[in-house]
Amino acid sequence: MSRKLDSPIKTQMAVALVKSPLNGEFREFNKVGMKTPVGRRRVFVQTETGCVLGLELDRSDNAHTVKRKLQVALNFPIEESSLTFGDLVLKNDLTAVRSDSPLLLTRNNFHRSSSTPCLSPMRADLQQRRDESSPIEILGNSVSFSFVRQMAKDITKAVKKGIDPVAVNSGLGGAYYFKNSRGESVAIVKPTDEEPYAPNNPKGFVGKALGQPGLKRSVRVGETGYREVAAYLLDKEHFANVPPTALVKITHSIFNVNDGVKASKPMEKMLVSKIASLQQFIPHDYDASEHGTSNFPVSAVHRIGILDIRILNTDRHSGNLLVKKLDGDGMFGQVELVPIDHGLCLPETLEDPYFEWIHWPQASIPFSEDELKYIANLDPLGDCEMLRRELPMVREASLRVLVLCTIFLKEAAANGLCLAEIGEMMTREVRPGDEEPSEIEVVCLEAMSLIGEKDAESPRSDLGNDIEFQFDIDCEEVTDCTKKLALPLGLTFGNARGQLSKVEETTEDGEEEEEEDREEEENDRADLEKMPTIKLSMSLKSTLLGEKSQKYQKHPGARVESAYASSAHRSADEQIPSSTSFVKLSDMSEEEWTIFLEKYQELLYPAIEKRKSITLGQKQRQRLGTSCQF
């Protein structure tokens, strides 16, 4: 039987509601069973080890008072600590924090290990406080969450009747099926502090604090839940069929709390509160890995692919595509695809995506008129404003990735590329021991180089004499070379023989063309040596961007074995398969970002045309056969 939800909280990770008199009138219900008085904000403060505190803030409260309340309630040390709200470090003023927002409290320069326990509330405090909040509170007030609100009410009724959730055994992180009063699974809940490598991961994948690099280095531990919600909010008109998803504070005794001491006797199950993503559970017959793809509707594959392109999904494998039969036989066109697990989308840097559908025949079929119209109507800047409003904790670098990918999708679709071609342009070519930038990353690198040329040619009075335009590329420095990368002035992507343009392989139809290419490469290399150096700071000092034969070294720490099979007793850094970051967007100022976008859009058309010519050449060779040479 489930513990009564109004019982005293006895927990290592509980929401302890700090009591204070409630003055003034109450606002409308904006959560499940919770009211917030006028002039106040309710926020949720989470420590880097997963402890959660629900707080009612007055107008007079500041970052220091929030820390003090957390210290009193959870016995959490606040010396040398930082309170963050997405990218924003809250020094004192809390005006930027909206109601129902999650905040993260981290300790600066605090050495942690996988055995670091979650600091417990004082037992005296536990006896004095009761969790007077609702078992489920939705973080945010979007109208898109109306279905989730009703679902939360159904779950609350079921829990009060003693219908317990069930833990999901598969996967790397903690996940739980919550049920309605009839005992039917209606939602899957994924606590943020039970993600892979998070402090309370129930499957041994621990060793990181919340906010540190996670399974993907560009997606931080504890932030996949935000991305699940972002994917749902970005799926306008339910175009790709993403199930309703919201970020919630949820309380139950089933959740996992790792005991750092590993006591000899099992810990007593206690009510614990977590910040988690809550997504509608979709009954299905199988996933895409358990069935052939030939009967998948073209439109469903296209719609999911369009979403994956926009959000740069780095984890679209067949296991997170649910398949529902719409008739008894499941004949062609009679199945429905439901995409789930979007926690590794919207990375903070341009990552190498994984698109399972890229080689499916449906992806090579041209977009329909309805799909082209949907793509044309996408508004990346409007989408960013929506996410800033609904999920203000999403980091600005992730929003910039959304903008770049959506702009590319719109340009590519308008110029006749199919889904497979678009996906190929975004995907890196990986060879044993090497990782090379994708075609889109090459466009970004060239846009950066053109900005560098502009800075070298024009006076710097606009930006200030002491500002150096700098982009960091997080690649390992593998040689003793320390010379700055020199790029030719006037370099344009339209010239297929330009240094950066040649990062992508061209179609070679004969020996004569190959010989001409080699001669032109030698001439370009000679011209390169004569050009002045541009102040484009890069750590990739050993690499000439203009030559794909120069291999991009893998990020240090990359391993052959998969992190999915690694020993949980090794450090999280050892378990994470590294990925090189060729393009970093977070360091750009707003002015630099605006200029970069202009250059990026200018370079997209010639890059797309080049891809079309490559595809045409491949089709011609397929028709003629590989033995034919002219």
UniProtKB/Swiss-Prot annotation:
Organism per entry:
Arabidopsis thaliana (Mouse-ear cress)
Ranges annotated as biased composition (Acidic residues):
506-524
Ranges for region Activation loop: 339-365
Keywords (A to Z) from UniProt = ATP-binding, Kinase, Nucleotide-binding, Phosphoprotein, Transferase
User: What are the start and end residues of every segment in region (Catalytic loop)?
Assistant: 312-320
**Where would I find the Ubiquitin-like domain in this sequence?**
41-98
Q: How does it assemble?
A: Interacts with AHK2.
Name the InterPro entries on file: P4KG1-8 (IPR044571), PI3/4_kinase_cat_dom (IPR000403), Ubiquitin-like_domsf (IPR029071)
Reactions the enzyme catalyzes: a 1,2-diacyl-sn-glycero-3-phospho-(1D-myo-inositol) + ATP = a 1,2-diacyl-sn-glycero-3-phospho-(1D-myo-inositol 4-phosphate) + ADP + H(+)
What GO molecular functions are on record for this protein? 1-phosphatidylinositol 4-kinase activity; ATP binding; protein histidine kinase binding
Q: Does the keyword NADP apply?
A: no
State the top-level EC class. Answer: transferase
Residue segments, region G-loop:
168-174
Q: Where does ATP bind?
A: N169, S170, G171, L172, G173, G174, A175, K190, Q279, Q280, F281, I282, D341
Domain named PI3K/PI4K catalytic is located at: 162-459
Q: Which residues carry this modification: Phosphoserine?
A: S571
Q: What is the lineage of its organism?
A: Eukaryota, Viridiplantae, Streptophyta, Embryophyta, Tracheophyta
Please describe what this protein does. Answer: The phosphorylation of phosphatidylinositol (PI) to PI4P is the first committed step in the generation of phosphatidylinositol 4,5-bisphosphate (PIP2), a precursor of the second messenger inositol 1,4,5-trisphosphate (InsP3).
- What CDD domains does the annotation carry? Ubl_ubiquitin_like
Name of the protein in its database record: Phosphatidylinositol 4-kinase gamma 5
Tell me what gene encodes this: PI4KG5
EC number in record: 2.7.1.67
Q: Which GO terms describe its biological process?
A: cellular response to hypoxia
* Entry similarity comment: Belongs to the PI3/PI4-kinase family. Type II PI4K subfamily.
- Start and end residues of each stretch annotated as Disordered: 500-527
Q: Which domain of life is it from?
A: Eukaryota
